[in-house]
Amino acid sequence: MGQKVHPNGIRLGIVKPWNSTWFANTQDFADNLDGDFKVRKFLNKELANASVSRIIIERPAKSIRVTIHTARPGIVIGKKGEDVEKLRNAVSQIAGVPAQINIAEVKKPELDAKLVADSIASQLERRVMFRRAMKRAVQNAMRLGAKGIKVEVSGRLGGAEIARSEWYREGRVPLHTLRADIDYNTAEAHTTYGVIGVKVWIFKGEILGGMAAVIESEQQPAAQPKKQARKGRK
């Protein structure tokens, strides 16, 4: 029976960057890793309703820098930045070093696998029909420019006695092509019948040039649309 490798894990260092970027010697490595795990667990719990996509952790010179990618930055920042200051103090206490928190906005949440999976899971918890939730997510992603998307849900679908899996795909999702930019993530829907698992694969196109191209695209600011000069009457 064929098994699927984790799409993010197999592409690390090829077209996918790491979520934690720091270097540590043997003595500090375990502490840093444990600190990262605790910080992520805390932030995911605190920001459960803030549409958090990714949490990037860097550790420059005995400090910690956390970048939160979210579709709703206003909720994370709070009124006059109060909430983000509370998060900074809490992260600093967990990690044991001074903390800095940056917020990055996700411009198109419909093309982010984590946010799509969370959206489907929340709909299933609200008793929306699973086929409708899947189809809506697929249509929104394709409308906004995805090259392909696949959604799979598994569990006691519709309250059935026997658990099963169902999936829906549109476009192409090349899992074997290493240069393919495939965003993959999962979520869980806790329903009255039990847990339903949600998996989402989104194919955004091929990346030519490897990690160098990925880093360059992340560093470049989003291009501002040019305002056309209005022609006056002569």
From Swiss-Prot:
Entry GO MF terms: mRNA binding; rRNA binding; structural constituent of ribosome
CDD domains membership: KH-II_30S_S3
Record carries keyword Disulfide bond: no
Domain KH type-2, first and last residues per copy: 39-107
GO cellular component, one term: cytosolic small ribosomal subunit
An individual GO BP term: translation
Record keywords, A-Z: Ribonucleoprotein, Ribosomal protein, RNA-binding, rRNA-binding
Pfam family, one: Ribosomal_S3_C
Highest taxon, organism lineage: Bacteria
Gene3D superfamilies found in the cross-reference section: 3.30.300.20, Ribosomal protein S3, C-terminal domain (3.30.1140.32)
NCBIfam families in the cross-refs: rpsC_bact
UniProt-listed HAMAP family: Ribosomal_uS3_B (MF_01309_B)
Family: Belongs to the universal ribosomal protein uS3 family.
Assembly and oligomerization: Part of the 30S ribosomal subunit. Forms a tight complex with proteins S10 and S14.
Stated role: Binds the lower part of the 30S subunit head. Binds mRNA in the 70S ribosome, positioning it for translation.
Name by which UniProt lists this protein: Small ribosomal subunit protein uS3
UniProt source species: Haemophilus ducreyi (strain 35000HP / ATCC 700724)
